[in-house]
């Protein structure tokens, strides 16, 4: 009887265990279902584009607009990067003065020792940013020869934020310097790898993936292609007269066009539409109005280009700027309309990534497009 009693208890225990297992399975399935629904409800945006096109600045704008911006500690951590931008900028300009053809001399020969000092600190990685350094930078930036070399920066590789920070050297050099949001947007740090930013707009979840744009970073892009709602392709329109860092030969805008074409025609992406951010419109306008670098010298077809009748210029926009920006837009649209089979589309927008209001407006305009892409992705449309 003892044996029978024991077996009965074991059977009872097994029943309890089975019930607990079923309950546990139900909980797991419920959680998985919840995660599946959350995954389906999330809009995944992949930011692509050539190096230095402004992708990371777009991500920073999303943080400012939708993730409570940057806290004091994060701002403090960026001070060193900003001062490194100042150092890189002045080192690059001063070094280029003797290498560009024809070379540019210092306007004030008394600044020679300052130039020598800047060149001497160039290789130092853990540099201490002393007041002596900032004083030399300020004096050199005031030198007309240095300014003349800066004006020819398309002949060498100079970070976009050079002028911005060199003109703000008094603020950046302060002991109690606190970067502004605009300083953080302008700060240049090379993106290596894949960075994900999560944010919510009107209760809709967005995941934005920022991938390094340099050639050796692009092989990582394929890891992000799975289940992407849309691609935001960022092109630096002001780069029409510049060459890429990787080979100092290939035109940057041509590189961006070639990259766009390879993404547009990629067999894995033939159903994913592209939102095209024609970026750096502020810098494009400056170059066009300065008249020193003519677009037709780099893109001969510009000489015969006519602005489309349906083109809408911005209020007060110079016709030369309107013509330039629509020409570059049409270079990209020519690629997207040549192929596509109606399975994916290209939606162009003129952007200035450092202008928070511009990005707010453009992203709001894009949200309906992204929503339609998302519904189509899960065959709900």
From Swiss-Prot:
Residues 183-191 are annotated as: G2 motif. Gene3D superfamilies: GI Alpha 1, domain 2-like (1.10.400.10), P-loop containing nucleotide triphosphate hydrolases (3.40.50.300). Residues 41-381 form the G-alpha domain. A lipid is attached at residue 3 (S-palmitoyl cysteine). Signal peptide: none annotated. One of its GO terms (cellular component) is heterotrimeric G-protein complex. It catalyses: GTP + H2O = GDP + phosphate + H(+). Residues 206-215 are annotated as: G3 motif. This is Guanine nucleotide-binding protein G(olf) subunit alpha. The gene is GNAL.
């Amino acid at each position: 009887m003892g044996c029978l009693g024991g077996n009965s208890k074991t059977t009872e225990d097994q029943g309890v265990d089975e019930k607990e297992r079923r309950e546990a399975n139900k909980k797991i399935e419920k959680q998985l279902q919840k995660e599946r629904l959350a995954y389906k409800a999330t809009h995944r945006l992949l930011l692509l584009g050539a190096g230095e096109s402004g992708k990371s600045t777009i991500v920073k704008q999303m943080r400012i607009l939708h993730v409570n911006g940057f806290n004091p500690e994060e701002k403090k951590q960026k001070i060193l990067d900003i001062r490194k931008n100042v150092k890189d900028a002045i080192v690059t300009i001063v070094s280029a003065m003797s290498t560009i053809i024809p070379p540019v001399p210092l306007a004030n020969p008394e600044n020679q020792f300052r130039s020598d000092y800047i060149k001497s600190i160039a290789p130092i990685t853990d540099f201490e940013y002393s007041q002596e350094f900032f004083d030399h930078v300020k004096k050199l930036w005031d030198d007309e020869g240095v300014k003349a070399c800066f004006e020819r920066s398309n002949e060498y590789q100079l970070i976009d934020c050079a002028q911005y920070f060199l003109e703000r050297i008094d603020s950046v050099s302060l002991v109690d310097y606190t970067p502004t949001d605009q300083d953080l947007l302008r700060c240049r740090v090379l993106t290596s790898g894949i960075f994900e930013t999560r944010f919510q707009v009107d209760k809709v979840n967005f995941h934005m993936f920022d991938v390094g744009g340099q050639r050796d970073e692009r092989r990582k892009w394929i890891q992000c292609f799975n289940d992407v709602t849309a691609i935001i392709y960022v092109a630096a329109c002001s780069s029409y007269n510049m060459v890429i860092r990787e080979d100092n030969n290939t035109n940057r805008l041509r590189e961006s066009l070639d990259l766009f074409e390879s993404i547009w025609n990629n067999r894995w992406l033939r159903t994913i539409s592209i939102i095209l951010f024609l970026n750096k419109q502020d810098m494009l306008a400056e170059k066009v109005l300065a008249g020193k670098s003519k677009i037709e010298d780099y893109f001969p077809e510009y000489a015969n280009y006519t602005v489309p009748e349906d083109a809408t210029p911005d209020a007060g926009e110079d016709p030369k700027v309107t013509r330039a920006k629509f020409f570059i837009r049409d270079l990209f649209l020519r690629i997207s309309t040549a192929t596509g089979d109606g399975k994916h589309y290209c939606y162009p927008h003129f952007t200035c990534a450092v202008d928070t209001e511009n990005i707010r407006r453009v992203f709001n305009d894009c949200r309906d497009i992204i929503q339609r892409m998302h519904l189509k992705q899960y065959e709900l449309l």
